[in-house]
Amino acid sequence: MVEKLWGGRFEASLDKQTEEFGASIKFEQRLAPFDLKGSLAHVKMLGETGIITAEEATTIANGLIKVEEKLMKGQIEFKIENEDIHMNMETYLHDEIGPLAGKLHTARSRNDQVATDMHLYLKSVLSDLLKALRTLRETIVNLSVNHVDTLMPGYTHLQHAQPISFAQHLMAYYQMFTRDFDRFEFNVKHTDMNPLGAAALAGTTFPIDRELTTNLLQFEKAYANSMDAVSDRDFILEFLSNSSLLMMHLSRLCEELLLWSSHEFNFVSLSDNYSTGSSIMPQKKNPDMAELIRGKSGRVYGNLMSLLTVMKGLPLTYNKDLQEDKEGMFDSADTILTSLSVMDGMLSTMTVNRVNMEKATEQDFSNATELADYLAAKGLPFREAHELVGQLVLTCIKKGIYLQEVSLKDYQALSQLIEEDVYEILQSRTAVSRRNSLGGTGFESIKKQIEQAKKELQK
């Protein structure tokens, strides 16, 4: 039987099922490099403050480096009987340097140790995530540059509303992902904090130097309150909340890619690299990757709700419930990083069917607003113009024609304000080009949006 580091107070050992139920090493293994990093900073501080001798600190540090080397070579076997990542690492350190390993835990608790590990882990994830989001935003901007003059229907209620530029549609997602970027960047602020030195909850009687470990671990600052340091999981909840918003945006884009790639729309074709086939229908090309991203949004939402539910009833400070804070964080990190990479690949390699997109703007009544605006610009109150055009649309539907096919004679019977220039106004390209209000779909407006985005991406 492996001796528990906390076993002195107990007369009996855990039974096997209970031991397995309470062990977290099955999912904590990815914290190993961060646990060792935290321990190296801690032992350096212990040595420099004289809490242990310089010789002891050097021996422990060298032992930790050897454990780190074994970890990198895949020579570490994680054992359930050692419970968690901390005790697994300390056991290997003990194998390297003997009983001196026990001095590493001076002025430290697993409570501040695990919090430190998670702050370090999430800082690393956020760094990778911000890079991935920047890459996706760049891809969207580059795609937009190529499609400023590509027309498509804009939708409300999934019905044709007004003609727009495809670039305008894409740049709407650029804005969403930029907000995601900003949220995760702010998330770094609350993650970049050092809990090490808070010990179990009340600090320590040893003359530790928390500023030193803060600098060694490259944290922005140390927690100001030891109880908050060991019980705070807001930084993870922020991450999960931000991840949920990101997955919602990715899911919305996936839904549109699924629609656009359907036979009925045929606006885009996704690359074979991001599609699969059917085991029974030879003709099928299924947009599975877009469907998977859409589906995986649910698990990220679930991870957020799971931790919120865990946290809502916890008194200060540490409770074993907090063991449930990791798997959802790990899963969400894996999910969003992979989803971002797959989305970037899908957008980079998809084929845009410009002809079908533009044709779709001509075989509808999405130019009805142009006619109403045309009449309003000539002095007719917009509400009256709206009523007249609505009646005309109904007449056209009954006749099986579109507004651009109505004769000038019939137009002038509707209103003497209408002249021959109305046919130019009714063209989709004209309709789009005229909408150059700030943020509008006009070609000049979109170019300004793209230029602004390029400046933002250079920061």
Curated annotation (Swiss-Prot):
Pathway: Amino-acid biosynthesis; L-arginine biosynthesis; L-arginine from L-ornithine and carbamoyl phosphate: step 3/3. Keywords: Amino-acid biosynthesis, Arginine biosynthesis, Cytoplasm, Lyase. It is found in: Cytoplasm. GO terms for biological process: arginine biosynthetic process via ornithine; L-arginine biosynthetic process. Its EC number is 4.3.2.1. Belongs to the lyase 1 family. Argininosuccinate lyase subfamily. This is Argininosuccinate lyase. It comes from Lactococcus lactis subsp. cremoris (strain SK11).
